């Protein structure tokens, strides 16, 4: 553990916690080969990357804690690697490390539960027109996409029908039945 014993003002031993990190975050996979229990996801995304047939939108569905957001980050890292799309990216990749840490300007993670209005989706649609700053692709990861309003889904539909070539979407949800069929039909599952 990242804890250590220290002494307080009275000389008593206390636990200090300078660098505590949740186990799930500490052991989060950094490569597709480390992703456990998601062989079908690794196979599908690996085939898309290796064949150069990367879809413009993906829908990741599953219970909480099964690796949807982690898979989205790994996918973003794989297709934005400096030397071209690859399933396994070296640990020393600057862009890859920034993506996995959530610090990359071109991989935007959005919480659908708190950013679910039509105006916010329209802003996203306007942002899509700008080219990526660092990466090959600008990737929008929308977590809990089922929480978007009907109007927000409709605002997103036009962008999904005619996406800019530099934009990819990854939608993650625990409740796919709440996502509009018109959105689902435009995504790779």
Regions found by a protein language model. Name each.
Residues 2-189:
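P-loop/Walker A NTP-binding region and its immediately flanking N-terminal helices
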């Amino acid at each position: 553990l990242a804890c250590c014993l220290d002494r307080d003002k009275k000389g008593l031993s206390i636990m200090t916690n300078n660098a505590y990190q949740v186990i799930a975050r500490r052991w989060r996979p950094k490569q597709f080969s480390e992703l456990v229990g998601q062989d079908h996801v690794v196979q599908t995304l690996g085939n898309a990357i290796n064949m150069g047939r990367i879809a413009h939108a993906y829908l990741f569905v599953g219970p909480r804690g099964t690796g949807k957001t982690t898979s989205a980050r790994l996918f973003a890292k794989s297709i934005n690697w400096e030397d071209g799309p690859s399933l396994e990216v070296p640990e020393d990749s600057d862009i890859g490390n920034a993506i996995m840490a959530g610090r990359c300007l071109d991989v935007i993670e959005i919480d659908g539960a708190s950013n679910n209005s039509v105006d916010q989706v329209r802003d996203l649609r306007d942002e899509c027109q700008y080219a990526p700053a660092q990466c090959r692709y600008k990737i929008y990861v929308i977590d809990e996409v089922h929480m978007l309003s009907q109007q927000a889904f409709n605002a997103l539909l036009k962008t999904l029908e005619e996406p800019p070539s530099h934009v990819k979407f990854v939608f993650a949800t625990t409740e796919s039945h709440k996502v509009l069929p018109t959105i689902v039909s435009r995504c790779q599952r």
